[in-house]
Structure formats: C-alpha cells, structure tokens
Curated annotation (Swiss-Prot):
Probably contributes, directly or indirectly, to early events in germination. May play a role in spore outgrowth. This is Probable spore germination lipoprotein YhcN. Residues 1-20 form the signal peptide. One of its GO terms (biological process) is sporulation resulting in formation of a cellular spore. Residues 24-79 are annotated as: Disordered. Disruption phenotype: Mutant sporulates normally and has the same resistance to heat and UV radiation than wild-type spores. It exhibits no defect in the initiation of spore germination, but the spore outgrowth is slower than that of wild-type spores. Mutant shows a reduced rate of spore germination in L-alanine. The gene is yhcN. It is found in: Forespore inner membrane. A lipid is attached at C21 (S-diacylglycerol cysteine). Induction: Expression is dependent on sigma G, and to a much lesser extent on sigma F. Keywords: Germination, Lipoprotein, Membrane, Palmitate, Signal. NCBIfam families: spore_YhcN_YlaJ. The keyword Isomerase does not apply. Residues 51-70 have a biased composition (Low complexity). The lineage of its organism: Bacteria, Bacillati, Bacillota, Bacilli, Bacillales.
Length: 189
C-alpha cells in the first residue's frame, strides 16, 4: 500500500516536525514568575523628607509580571504625618509667638501656637500670614497652612508630635489627628 519512499519520508518528517515545534516558544519565558525587584526613582532634592523627624524611607516594589496578584493594594502615602521642627523654630522666632508645634500631612501644615500676649483661640489674619510664610519657607510643597491658638488644639498637637517622634503606629494616630483637625478647622479642604 505505502511504498518504501513514503514510509521513509514519514519517518524522517515526524522527528523534524517535533523538533520544529519544540523551539516555537524559545525566549518566551514564564509570564507568572513574580520577578519582584526594588526600583528607586527618588530625587534626593525632592524626596519628601522636609527636614523632619519622622522619616519613613521605603522604596517602592515594582513587579515585572503579567499576573502580579495585587489585591487591595492601597499604597496610600497620604496617611503620613511629620513633625516639622525646623518650621516650628522659625515660627517661634516671631515676637508674637511663644511656642509652636507643627505637623505636616501631605501638602497641609497644621500649626498650634501659644501667643506671647496670652490670647487663646483666634489668631489675627496678619499673624496667620506671617506664620504661613515662615512655614512655607522651610517647605515649598506646603499648599495650605492652618493656624490655631486653641488651648485644646495646642495640647493635642504636642501629644501627637511626641507620639510621631516616638514612632507610635500611625493608623490610629492618623484617624485621631484627622478628627481633631476637622473639628478645629471645619472649613479646611
């Protein structure tokens, strides 16, 4: 039925086909190898450290993978509180200010001041502008500066500052800080 030439051709053709198919995915590699590597795109001139005491310097992980299994990946850097001692020192240099505590959250600065004249609560707009100028001189990324001489706010800010500098967990502290700020500055954006 089949001649010797046909049998010989099919015997030679089958291994040739098998060899050809085996090389088809050369260089493809695995798509789900979870090859994670650290990549640092930080610019030291703009590394969001702002001369403060709370320095969380964590590199971002980058995953070169088609299936990177990211579920509930919050990577929320907005929940960062920093004590701005340099700004507080500059604000305290003002003759109207006896003491200042400043916490920076993102591009917002919250300033609690004890005034030399003993006034508690309201701070004059002129003085607020001077304070804001001093704060922004230490950090060009600050968009809004909120100032209060409310005794309760001053006390809370001192406590928050100590907790941040001591490295207390930020989750509960951030929520508590946010509630306090919303109560003292209800019109803040």
């Amino acid at each position: 039925m089949f001649g010797k030439k046909q049998v010989l051709a099919s015997v030679l053709l089958i291994p040739l086909l098998m060899t050809g198919c085996g090389v088809a995915d050369q260089g493809e590699g695995r798509r789900d190898n979870n090859d994670v590597r650290n990549v640092n795109y930080r610019n030291p001139a703009n590394d969001d450290m702002r001369n403060v005491n709370n320095r969380d310097n964590v590199d971002n992980n980058v995953n070169d993978n088609v299936n990177n299994n990211r579920v509930n990946d919050d990577n929320n850097n907005d929940r960062k509180l920093e004590v701005a001692d340099e700004a507080a020192d500059k604000v305290t240099d003002l003759k109207e200010v006896k003491h200042a505590d400043i916490i920076v959250a993102g591009n917002q600065a919250y300033v609690a001041v004890v005034l030399t004249n003993g006034n508690k609560g309201a701070v004059e707009n002129n003085l607020k502008k001077k304070i804001a100028k001093k704060v922004r001189s230490t950090d060009k990324n600050i968009d809004n500066v909120y100032v209060s001489a409310n005794p309760d706010f001053v006390e809370r800010m001192q406590g928050y500052g100590k907790r941040i500098q001591n490295g207390d967990p930020i989750a509960g502290l951030f929520d508590e800080f946010t509630q306090t700020v919303q109560r003292v500055f209800p019109n803040a954006e």
